[in-house]
Amino acid sequence: MHAIFSSFSRKVVVNVGASSQSQLTKMVKKKPNQSRHLLPSRLSSPSSVPHFVPSAVSRSAKVHGFFASKLGNTNLKLKFGNVMESRAGFFSSELPSHGFESGGFTGFQKRGWKSWINGANGVVFGLVIANAAVFTMWRVSDRSWMLSTYSFTSGYIHTLITSGFSHIGTSQIILNMIGISYFGSRIARTLGPLYLLKLYFAGALGGSVCFLSYHALLATLKGEGVVIKDHQSTAPISQLLGADGSMFAIALLDMFIYPKVTTYFALMLRVHVMFRIINLGVEILNIPEGGPNHIASSSGQLGGVVVAAMAWARIKKGRF
């Protein structure tokens, strides 16, 4: 009896051990990741130890070289594009991204009044304010006092330049200020605010010199018996004042620098300027023939054209 019971207990123990061993084997096979996860990261498995593979190194070097070449070429293209844009921006029709036309009010809100006035637009704003102030003086003060007290005939040489700020006609000051605001802002951004100021004064001086030269030529021709029918040769000098010379110098130089037109507004202004220049040339050709002309009132425009041509010649030589 004892032998039977002992043999039966051995079979049960063997069966229980075999069944528990099979269950453990199944658990290990079903959840290998869990057992690996419980181990430390450095001792998890032999497969986690890095091995040196020459093919992988060569493959990574090729990939690295591919991306490095691509990124280098892209960076080179970007740098080359920036250089080309900076070189072509002076002569192209596209404008800088700051000023009256593009992003003006956004930058104005960020920078404020002081930086806006001190910049390129500040010179244009100052010229417009100065012309408006002198125009108001013509409206308020006595015209005879304005003409006789501060004039070139009274010995005031500076009036050769200050005459470029004097407007009497409303349409004249409106057209000139629109032209100066549009073309002047582009010149100031391209060549600098100081250059715009010098160009304005040079245009005013050139217009005054051409006006005086024309009257000197007119007196010489009349002394030789040549009759010239100038409808405005005896007109008061008040009709010959204005910033026509300065506006034409600025507008024509801008047309030389930016030959392409990008907006309809610019096209309208350029057509107006070119029409007046062509009309001026026709009137100059009529002088030797004794035909009727209005060259006296257009002499300021002629001075501006001459100043613009001289400025463009200096810019092409790199001196401006």
Curated annotation (Swiss-Prot):
UniProt-annotated location(s): Plastid, Chloroplast membrane
Keyword Chloroplast: yes
Targeting presequence: 1-87
Top-level taxon of the source organism: Eukaryota
Keyword Protease attached: no
Name of one Pfam family that matches: Rhomboid
Coiled coil: none
Sorted UniProt keywords: Chloroplast, Membrane, Plastid, Transit peptide, Transmembrane, Transmembrane helix
Chain segments annotated as transmembrane: 116-136, 160-180, 199-219, 247-267, 295-315
Membrane-related topology note: Multi-pass membrane protein
GO molecular function ontology, one term from the record: serine-type endopeptidase activity
Single GO cellular component term: chloroplast membrane
Family: Belongs to the peptidase S54 family.
Role of this protein: Probable rhomboid-type serine protease that catalyzes intramembrane proteolysis.
Name of this protein: Rhomboid-like protein 17, chloroplastic
Organism annotation: Arabidopsis thaliana
Lineage summary: Eukaryota, Viridiplantae, Streptophyta, Embryophyta, Tracheophyta
